[in-house]
């Protein structure tokens, strides 16, 4: 299954790179996700099979941070590839790079990974797959697209329908298990606090992690005008901190501290998030990558410390025959949590921008008047021109596509007063700063929720759990 997933993911990456239309790219990305979902659970399951009980804590502890490091390091690599524009490929290179990586994974799997088979023949739960897939789509699509579509009524109908479908999924899986058939998700897992608590923690934790990454990238690239490479390098201290946190956790802290390490790591993450928010608020438009190091470094350290024991604690509380099912559910919740975080923080971020822009224009009325006076705009025309500037900036930040010029800005583009461009850029940067700070505050609350939910997990990850 791992090899099938790797082959499919690599082929889908090739299709993404060769896409000739947005529709093809979207379809190829969906295929990527499908085969990626085949790979990830196998990794967790094979760890349980390949390592002895005494070694599993460190093995599980390596899995989460490696995934998180990929999420943090990915933007750095992507920014470098886009800026370098190798062979004139532009953004396509971020998909072409998956070809050698995928080939390496496939060869490595055949060479180093043993083949494990169940002692009894298993039948794929096709109906369960369909129900889970439909339920996931009904929840994820409106969460991701709701803001762009201005939250029409049918979006909330889809969300409600998604919950109903997942309810039917649970009933179906329970009945299938009672009939002695193989369920997609073992119902007995939901009776174990380690598993249900892990799902809740993962939802909040990865929602904050992935959502914050998106918001911060938008602020750096769109708000401050950083290039993709510069934006990626700006987050390098976070990646370094994460490696340091992972190394510290792997030195024996996971075995000695268990849940306490996850709690401590989450606290360090919260400190880092607060530090980044304060830095952004104080530095404003003068922000440089150097300013962010004191906040991003502990943010990364906390990520490493928290993620290292996460999978170990959760999976140590399930039986051997439940590992595959639990692994699949955990990785699914990780993706669902990421989508929820993107939807929530994205809605907050973009929802605040238009109002923040108009507020800053109103607060800077004296400065705008000085710009008009210097440009020789007659006093009688200044209120109308100021209103037009206000409308233009409001519509510009509310536009989904930053390359599209709103109709309200077309009348100004040809005869803009001198100094107005600088004024407008300053207002937009201030609005992005305010939206980023508030969104980081929401992410802080999500991390606080993950901290509280972590008390549902076992106190320690016993290496002999399930044996």
Predicted regions and their residues:
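Transmembrane-helix exit segments and adjacent C-terminal regions of multi-pass membrane proteins
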Residues: 175, 312, 372-467
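Transmembrane-helix signature of multi-pass solute transporters
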Residues: 8-19, 31, 35, 101-108, ...
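Transmembrane core module of solute transporters
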Residues: 157, 165, 174-322, 444, ...
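Small-residue-rich alpha-helical segments with characteristic i,i+4
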Residues: 40, 45, 57-73, 235, ...
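Residue-level signature of the transmembrane alpha-helical cores
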Residues: 2-8, 12, 28, 35, ...
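Helix-loop-helix hairpins in multi-pass membrane proteins, especially solute transporters
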Residues: 1-127
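Interfacial helix-cap and linker-helix signal at transmembrane-aqueous boundaries
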Residues: 77-87, 143, 220-221, 252-254, ...
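Hydrophobic transmembrane-helix bundles of small-molecule transporters
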Residues: 83-200, 208, 226-227, 234
């Amino acid at each position: 299954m791992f090899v099938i997933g790797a082959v499919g993911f690599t082929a889908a990456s090739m299709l993404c790179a060769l896409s000739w239309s947005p529709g093809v790219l979207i379809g190829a990305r969906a295929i990527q996700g499908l085969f990626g979902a085949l790979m990830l659970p196998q990794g967790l399951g094979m760890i349980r099979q390949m390592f002895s009980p005494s070694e599993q804590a460190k093995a599980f502890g390596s899995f989460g941070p490696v995934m998180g490091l990929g999420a943090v390091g990915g933007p750095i690599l992507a920014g470098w590839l886009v800026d370098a524009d190798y062979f004139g490929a532009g953004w396509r290179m971020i998909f072409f790079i998956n070809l050698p990586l995928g080939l390496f994974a496939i060869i490595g799997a055949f060479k180093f990974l043993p083949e494990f088979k169940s002692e009894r023949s298993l039948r794929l739960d096709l109906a369960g797959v369909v129900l889970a897939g439909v339920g996931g789509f009904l929840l994820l699509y409106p969460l991701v697209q709701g803001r762009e579509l201005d939250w029409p009524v049918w979006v909330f109908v889809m969300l409600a329908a998604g919950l109903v479908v997942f309810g039917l999924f649970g009933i179906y899986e329970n009945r299938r298990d009672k009939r002695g058939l193989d369920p997609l998700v073992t119902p007995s897992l939901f009776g174990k606090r380690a598993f249900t608590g892990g799902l809740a923690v993962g939802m909040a934790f990865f929602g904050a992690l992935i959502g914050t990454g998106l918001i911060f990238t938008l602020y750096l690239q769109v708000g401050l005008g950083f290039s993709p490479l510069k934006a990626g390098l700006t987050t390098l201290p976070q990646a370094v901190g994460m490696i340091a946190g992972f190394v510290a956790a792997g030195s024996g802290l996971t075995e000695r501290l268990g849940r306490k390490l996850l709690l401590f790591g989450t606290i360090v993450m919260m400190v880092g998030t607060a530090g980044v928010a304060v830095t952004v608020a104080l530095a404003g438009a003068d922000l440089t990558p150097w300013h962010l190091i004191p906040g991003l470094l502990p943010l990364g350290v906390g990520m490493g410390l928290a993620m290292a024991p996460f999978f170990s604690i959760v999976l140590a509380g399930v039986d051997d025959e439940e590992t595959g099912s639990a692994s699949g559910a955990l990785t699914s919740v990780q993706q669902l949590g990421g989508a929820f975080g993107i939807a929530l923080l994205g809605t907050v971020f973009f929802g605040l921008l238009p109002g923040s822009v108009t507020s800053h224009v109103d607060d800077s009325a004296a400065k705008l008047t000085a710009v008009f006076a210097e440009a020789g705009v007659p006093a009688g025309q200044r209120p109308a021109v100021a209103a037009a500037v206000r409308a233009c900036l409001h519509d510009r930040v509310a536009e989904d596509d930053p390359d599209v010029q709103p109709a309200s800005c077309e009348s100004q583009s040809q005869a803009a007063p001198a100094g107005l461009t600088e004024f407008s850029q300053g207002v937009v940067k201030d609005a992005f700063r305010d939206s980023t700070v508030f969104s980081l505050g929401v992410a802080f609350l999500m991390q606080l929720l993950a901290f509280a939910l972590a008390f549902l997990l076992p106190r320690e990850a016993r290496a002999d759990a399930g044996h």
